Amino acid sequence: MCDIYGGYAGIREKLMEKLRHPYFINYIEEPFIDEEKIALLYGALKSANLHIEQIEHYVVTIMLVQIALDTHERVSNKAGEEANESHKRRQLTVLAGDYYSGLYYYLLSMNRDIVLIRALAEGIKEINEHKIMLYQKAHETMDDIMESVVVIESALLQKTCDHFHLSHWKPFITYVLGKNRLQKECELHAEKQHSPVFQAVQGIMKDQAEVETVINGWMMELRKKENQFLENHTDISKINSVLRDKSKT
């Protein structure tokens, strides 16, 4: 498994190099990097028997898209909460998101990955549509909210799996990333910060205790499905255990 450790570490460093723009570093927060998404992408593409240079290229470019989306969302979330945040800082954060997105298009176009660009563009479209529904509390059922959570968190990875014919990874990605997002929302809610998922659920269920029960129930169900999946897919379980350990170091 040493090659997995080395490959993962090398890819993470390549991604960091792309993100280290000297001007942005001085004025805005460092972009959030979802280590688990890197690990899932690396593990899935590793199982597709791609060469390490190909894996590195795809993981870095796809994570640039994810970070661009997360950076733009960070501006939207903070705009109403931090009235004293400088206008310049917000503008630079938006520009940073655009910069990361532009890097993604550039890197994929250099390799003429037109089909993958189209697939990821569809994923971006779906993510943005579900973000709008979540923030506008446009859902009619609890299942609709959960669907939006899963799409927002996993669409880029799901489209990548479709492109490389890795359908056996898709359920696992859904369980892990859905659970992670709900855990993050619970932490935000506990700290009395803005939680889009809690607010969306509250739009349907008014009782605060019931809202917490529902979201905790979703997390337990996803964790159960994740564990059951790993029991039945030892190949993914082995890769996952190595990458999980690495992503925590």
Role assignments for model-derived ranges:
Residues 1-249:
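All-alpha prenyltransferase/terpene-synthase fold signal
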